[in-house]
């Protein structure tokens, strides 16, 4: 099933299994691309989670401008016993954010993955709060409110899950706990120029009749800087993206 959804070309850089995973094990999947300065803050926030039954999957999307991969491998080796399984893989060539997330799902063996980029952070109770809603209550995904930090400070735009809310724009960030079965149902993330992969992913949830739940607590930290999706807002490709999104999801009213 997984191979039919996504075929990935990557090399295993590090893999350590402390003990066998079980139905309650959650994988935190980190997408890494040239974030040498931020990656350690991200990983420390994962290490400090109160939810102990965690695996870690770092997918390096062929970083070349800095020592991101080397730092990630060294940190993971030093902290591998904290996790059920700690894994670092590297794409053979740069494949984009959507493919990095697909690689994480395809290479993991847990029922759910928490998705985050290497420049972001999570508060210690994030996974503990989200886990029961996906593992026990059966929601396809669970997400919280964001805290912006970096170049911009403030609260995010997350709200209660409603298909109607997606008609005009995306309001749910990638940082969410997602069931592997839901990822399979929507056939993974689709690469879209300009960074609208997350919007498309959640719209595929709507298309498939999947339910997610919003937890109104501030548990995820989104770093805003010059290259973040929040700041660039994909302006250069905005009109083309609107056309593509409305072709993929005709019920959208974005751009009207």
Stretch-by-stretch model annotation:
Residues 91-108:
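Glycine-rich, basic loop-to-helix element that forms the pyrophosphate-binding segment
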Residues 113:
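Short aromatic/hydrophobic "clamp" motif used to bind/position activated sugar donors
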Residues 47-89:
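Acidic donor-binding segment of Leloir-type glycosyltransferases
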Residues 145, 212-219:
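Catalytic beta-strand/loop signature of glycosyltransferases that borders the donor
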Residues 159-177:
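A recurrent flexible, glycine/aromatic-enriched loop bordering the glycosyltransferase active site
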Residues 1-45:
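N-proximal low-complexity "stem/linker" segments adjacent to membrane-targeting elements
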Residues 194-203:
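Acidic donor-binding loop at a coil-to-helix junction in glycosyltransferase catalytic cores
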Residues 125-156:
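Conserved donor NDP-sugar-binding/catalytic core segment of glycosyltransferases
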